Amino acid sequence: MIFSAVRVSILGFLFTYSACAATLQVGSQRTLKLPSEAAKLAKDGDVVTIDAGVYPGDVAIWPQQRLILRGLGQRVHLDSEGKSAENKAIWVLKGNDITVENIEFSGATASTLNGAGIRFEGTHLTIRHCHFHHNQMGLLTGVNLLSDILIENSEFNDNTVDYQRYGKLGHNIYIGNIRHFTLRNSYIHDASTGHNVKSRAQENYLLYNRISDEHNGSSYLVDLPDGGQAYLIGNLFHQSANAENAAMLAFAAEHHQTEPSQQLYVVNNTFVNDYRGGSFLNNHSIATAVLINNLLLGQATVIVGPNLQKHNLMNVDARLKYPATFDYRLLPASAAIDQGMDPGLAANGFKLRPEFQYRHPLGGEVRPRQGAIDVGAYELSGK
């Protein structure tokens, strides 16, 4: 009877919480015309839907917990026109358990030169189907060792600061010291002078992304300055000839170089490097980086730092489908076909064999299983 009473009480609480949650609608034909108006009215657990359109100069602070902030229809565009809330970002998210979907963020600047599309100051964030561009920073987060962040099916590009003028870097993605960061099925490109992806998370999972310079030259494609545990699987990496740094990937460049428990797994990625004399990886730590089934193409010929290599192919006749447009799928005559091995499990039990592959733009698809695995980010279908 006591258990039943407690159960009824819990169910009653859940029902009350669910009943209190509301959906706030924003749009030119709605009572709430701007997202910033909804930010002042929303309660914990609410859903805020925003009609498609451009919302110029509108910035907001969201202090609530458990929010879903969702654009409807064609992309909702928050063009801040140089403004930022709290001199930080278009949206400053202070609460926990926040989801942001189908929204475009651009134009953020701040006097501190780190005006972001989103500044996240809470615990646990999910970003889906969003586009961050032409801000000083795309996404910027703080330190929170309890926080997990997931970005999927999203695009970040051209978030930067004029380094020649100000001497500071802007990054497409800058993740602070959090517990767990996952980036998957996303398109991260053209971080001029800054990094495409910079993360100080304790665990980093970069899965099935296209991370590339293309029109600009980034500092690093991926910078993990504090090391940690990192799993880079099934990505396309392209570094341009005018990149700021020689290395495509940097691991533990700033801290924890002598920490023996760090782990770096680089599995079934395709690297194309147009930077003459560059390196695919610069591992600054004493930990041994594990590289398996990677396709390594272009001007770079070096992997710097302790490493263990298995079934990688360097500068072979890869026969990529449309390399000039960064389409690195394999043609039937590629030397990468059936040349890989089953990479097995990481030390923590994480499966290293790629289950998916990137599909442009901003998508993923199941990677076929046909005979021995192909080297690189793509499996030739129908072989």
Protein language model annotation of sequence segments:
Residues M1-S4:
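N-terminal secretory signal peptides that target proteins for export/translocation
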Residues R7-S9, G27, G376:
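N-terminal non-cleavable signal-anchor helices
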Residues R7-Y17:
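Bacterial N-terminal signal peptides
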Residues S18-E37, L41, R319-A324:
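Right-handed parallel beta-helix/beta-solenoid
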Residues L24-S28, H284, P368:
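Alpha-helix initiation/capping motif
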Residues S36, D51, P56-R329, A333-A335, ...:
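Extracellular beta-rich repeat passengers
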Residues V48:
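Glycine-rich N-terminal segment of FAD-binding domains in flavoprotein oxidoreductases
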